[in-house]
């Protein structure tokens, strides 16, 4: 059984990819991986896991503002993840969470950001569904 209705998946996947990319692009001197870990373990992301329409329908900029206010979040100094990788990681995590119906806080522990950074070269050209299945339920 999937985490929520299939009708939501493409929007959630796209918005999370855009969110991760937005953070990496606008803050090249901040730690994108630390943001991703915080976001995936947040109440904001839990609301998306639970298909709460208010959060599920937000755009990436709206989601960023909501997350920062709700979680009292500030970015940490560090290095941004570059290129298309943040977008892909966001999409991968959103689809993985939906596909295996796991809490996002568990997904980021089972499939760490560092693993996805290393596996990016071999996975990012695959269809997202196939990439998620290749990684498998850890």
Summary of predicted features, one role per range:
Residues 1-101, 110, 114, 119-138:
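C-terminal alpha-helical interaction appendages
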């Amino acid at each position: 059984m999937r985490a929520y209705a299939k009708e939501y998946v493409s929007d959630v996947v796209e918005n999370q990819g855009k969110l991760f990319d937005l953070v990496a692009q606008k803050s090249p001197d901040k730690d994108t991986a630390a943001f991703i870990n915080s976001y995936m373990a947040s109440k904001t992301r839990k609301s998306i896991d639970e298909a709460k329409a208010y959060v599920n329908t937000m755009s990436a900029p709206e989601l960023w503002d909501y997350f920062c206010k709700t979680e009292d979040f500030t970015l940490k100094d560090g290095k941004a993840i570059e290129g298309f990788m943040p977008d892909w990681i966001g999409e991968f995590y959103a689809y993985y969470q939906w596909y295996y119906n796991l809490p996002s806080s568990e997904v980021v522990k089972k499939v760490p950001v560092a693993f996805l950074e290393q596996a990016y070269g071999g996975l990012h050209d695959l269809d997202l569904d196939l990439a998620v299945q290749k990684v498998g339920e850890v």
